[in-house]
């Protein structure tokens, strides 16, 4: 029996954070034995916001090296760079013609990003969800690991797939969301009511995977908790967002349950919690960065992995695109 197909990807824009690691990359590693996994670096999506060309090239290879450092195995998974597979944009054009203007206008991420980048509200930003739909449908993905901020885009992907299938038969698998039960949402250190974001301009909110572990430890020790007297280390997202975020991070890094951590820190000060989180995260980053540099310093290996991954991805992508072109009436040669 064939394994379910899973596809996911990360933009090479901004340094990846511990939120990307705990919420995505580490979850992907666990999926490799049970699913047929395709993991891409979505550089086409990245240019919806202006990028420095050299920085984008460097960041793309950085992300590839981080994939490998985290344990994503090219022998088990297909790892590729989005722009190396032209079928993504070819399918996206066809899907654009089966997607309505009003549907795109309702996308909350477009509204958010266009407000932040008012000087560059481009058509690519507007149709971003259609390219994302093409990314997913091209590989007949059954499940897509998504965070809360991408659920709306997966819903429009399902709508497009169902619309196309109703017209032309069951050409596309209709994907389901895969939302992990734990580690899916790491919050900002200083503003724990909002998600940690690699694009946050206040870098004290963010734990970057490639940051100096000592600098990260200092950030964690300055993280927001609360003013309860006496201090109570308890998981309560509504009333103790900062403490809950630190517990989530510590649970993700150590593998201990929230209940175990609450018992461990019963009667202790917030400084004790912060110190433990800082030590555990610093140790994890040190190990991860050693593995990262091992791969990043071998650019020939990275290029080989990207090339082989693109070849494997294109085999699957071409089969889907050929079927779509046949369905809509294009002449084949």
Swiss-Prot record:
Question: Where on this chain does ATP bind?
Answer: 11-13, 19-20, 147-149, 186, 195-199
Q: Give yes or no: UniProt keyword Ion transport.
A: no
Q: Which UniProt keywords apply?
A: Aminoacyl-tRNA synthetase, ATP-binding, Cytoplasm, Ligase, Nucleotide-binding, Protein biosynthesis
Where in or outside the cell it occurs: the entry states: Cytoplasm
Q: Motif 'KMSKS' region residues?
A: 195-199
Q: Which Pfam families match?
A: tRNA-synt_1b (PF00579)
Q: What does this protein do?
A: Catalyzes the attachment of tryptophan to tRNA(Trp).
Fetch the PANTHER family from UniProt: TRYPTOPHAN--TRNA LIGASE, MITOCHONDRIAL
Q: What is this protein called?
A: Tryptophan--tRNA ligase
Q: Which organism is it from?
A: Pasteurella multocida (strain Pm70)
**What gene does this protein come from?**
trpS
């Amino acid at each position: 029996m064939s394994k379910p197909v899973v596809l996911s990807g990360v933009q090479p824009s901004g340094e990846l954070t511990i939120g990307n690691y705990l919420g995505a990359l580490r979850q992907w590693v666990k999926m490799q034995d049970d699913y047929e996994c395709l993991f891409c670096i979505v550089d086409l999506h990245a240019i919806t916001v202006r990028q420095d060309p050299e920085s984008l090239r460097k960041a793309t290879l950085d992300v590839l090296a981080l994939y490998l450092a985290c344990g994503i195995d090219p022998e088990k998974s297909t790892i590729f760079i989005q722009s190396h597979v032209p079928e993504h944009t070819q399918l996206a054009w066809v899907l654009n013609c089966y997607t309505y203007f009003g549907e795109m206008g309702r996308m909350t991420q477009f509204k958010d990003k266009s407000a932040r980048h008012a000087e560059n509200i481009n058509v690519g930003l507007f149709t971003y969800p259609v390219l994302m739909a093409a990314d997913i449908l091209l590989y007949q993905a059954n499940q897509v690991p998504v965070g809360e901020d991408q659920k709306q885009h997966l819903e429009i992907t399902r709508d497009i797939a169902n619309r196309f299938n109703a017209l032309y038969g069951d050409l596309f698998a209709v994907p389901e969301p895969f939302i992990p039960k734990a580690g899916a949402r790491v919050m900002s250190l200083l503003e724990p009511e909002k998600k940690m974001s690699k694009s946050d301009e206040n870098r004290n909110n963010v734990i970057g995977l490639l940051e100096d572990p000592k600098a990260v430890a200092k950030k964690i020790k300055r993280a927001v908790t609360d003013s309860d007297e006496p201090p109570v280390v308890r998981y309560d997202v509504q009333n103790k967002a900062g403490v809950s975020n630190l517990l989530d991070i510590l649970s993700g890094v150590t593998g201990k349950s929230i209940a175990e951590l609450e018992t461990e820190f019963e009667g202790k000060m917030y400084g004790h919690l912060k110190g433990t989180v800082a030590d555990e995260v610093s140790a994890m980053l040190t190990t991860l960065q050693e593995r990262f540099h091992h791969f990043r310093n071998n650019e020939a290996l990275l290029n080989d992995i990207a090339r082989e991954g693109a070849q494997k991805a294109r085999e699957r992508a071409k089969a889907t695109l050929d079927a779509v072109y046949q369905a809509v009436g294009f002449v084949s040669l």
